[in-house]
């Protein structure tokens, strides 16, 4: 893989900014910028920046190359699971829609052209292990998102079967809230809720088996889905990245502990040592923490997709 670029914020004159999230910038692509022969419909340019967030706060320091690594992991999984579920990618060359004067090398590995879909307003979460907010729910109620689980399970223990635990989609700066399946049905309807649940568990099981063969445990993951004008369901946004998933090295996994993960845990652990109220603005992060975090993302990309950045 070529030398990584660093991008904190993307500004693309001529492409209307639709949304700037914690990590991704999303632009509308005017019809005249699309290549000749592009099918009817609306299209977006989705850019994965190197912004770093923790505790729902965007921090001032980027992780160099993080956006490229996230984009490459997503693209790998979109291709790997295309037989299970269609996705939002179009295959349109990013360079062909960029404004004049913009360096295409800056966006080549961190941006994709996607279909514009109607998002399903629920985060679709699959859990195969009892950790994080699921572990907290279980300790308090013996359930996770209203799903009964056996007594006596321990932290990080593998569940008898993967479970689907939806959550609300929060705005930037707010926190997602776990809901049960009945609440999702009330929000989106039974038919769509069942399609999303079935797709989520099907993809999770496939990805978990693949990752396990490579010495990685996929403990849980979060998907986003959208529908087109005909009601077809697509997986969209990011897919099975270290930001949206909890990956553990299999050789360091131990029930009863919180295993190390391929994500920004170094950053969260550092922030927990500070006298900081977990509200914006966030504190600066030491260079050593930045580099250790970057290396974790790079290792995940290498082990899962066979793509090396170092």
UniProtKB/Swiss-Prot annotation:
It catalyses: 5-amino-1-(5-phospho-D-ribosyl)imidazole-4-carboxylate + L-aspartate + ATP = (2S)-2-[5-amino-1-(5-phospho-beta-D-ribosyl)imidazole-4-carboxamido]succinate + ADP + phosphate + 2 H(+). It is an enzyme of class 6 (ligase). The keyword Signal does not apply. Pathway: Purine metabolism; IMP biosynthesis via de novo pathway; 5-amino-1-(5-phospho-D-ribosyl)imidazole-4-carboxamide from 5-amino-1-(5-phospho-D-ribosyl)imidazole-4-carboxylate: step 1/2. Its EC number is 6.3.2.6. PROSITE patterns: SAICAR_SYNTHETASE_1, SAICAR_SYNTHETASE_2. PANTHER family: PHOSPHORIBOSYLAMINOIMIDAZOLE-SUCCINOCARBOXAMIDE SYNTHASE (PTHR43700:SF1). This is Phosphoribosylaminoimidazole-succinocarboxamide synthase. It comes from Stenotrophomonas maltophilia (strain K279a). The lineage of its organism: Bacteria, Pseudomonadati, Pseudomonadota, Gammaproteobacteria, Lysobacterales.
């Amino acid at each position: 893989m070529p030398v990584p670029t660093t991008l904190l914020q993307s500004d693309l004159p001529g492409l209307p900014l639709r949304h700037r999230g914690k990590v991704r910038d999303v632009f509308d692509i005017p019809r005249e910028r699309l290549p000749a022969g592009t099918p009817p419909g609306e299209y977006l340019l989705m850019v994965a920046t190197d912004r770093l967030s923790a505790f729902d706060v965007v921090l001032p320091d980027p992780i160099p190359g993080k956006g490229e690594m996230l984009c490459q992991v997503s693209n790998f999984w979109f291709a790997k699971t295309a037989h299970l579920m269609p996705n939002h990618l179009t295959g349109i060359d990013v360079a062909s829609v960029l404004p004049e004067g913009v360096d295409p090398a800056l966006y080549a590995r961190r941006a994709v052209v996607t279909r514009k879909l109607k998002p399903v307003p629920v985060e679709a979460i699959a859990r195969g292990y009892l950790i994080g907010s699921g572990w907290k729910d279980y300790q308090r109620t013996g359930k996770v998102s209203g799903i009964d689980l056996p007594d006596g399970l321990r932290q990080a223990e593998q569940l008898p079967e993967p479970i689907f635990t939806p959550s609300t989609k929060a705005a930037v700066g707010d926190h997602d809230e776990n809901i049960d399946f009945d609440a999702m049905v009330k929000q989106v309807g039974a038919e769509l809720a069942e399609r999303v649940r079935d797709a989520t568990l099907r993809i999770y099981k496939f990805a978990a088996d693949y990752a396990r063969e490579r010495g990685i445990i996929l403990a849980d993951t979060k998907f986003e889905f959208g529908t087109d004008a005909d009601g077809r369901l697509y997986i969209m946004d990011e897919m099975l990245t270290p930001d949206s998933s909890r990956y553990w090295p299999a050789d360091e996994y131990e029930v009863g502990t919180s295993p190390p993960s391929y994500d920004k845990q170094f950053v969260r652990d550092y922030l927990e040592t500070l006298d900081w109220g977990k509200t914006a603005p966030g504190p600066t992060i030491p260079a050593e923490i930045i580099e250790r975090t970057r290396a974790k993302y790079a290792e995940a990309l290498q082990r899962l997709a066979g793509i090396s950045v170092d």
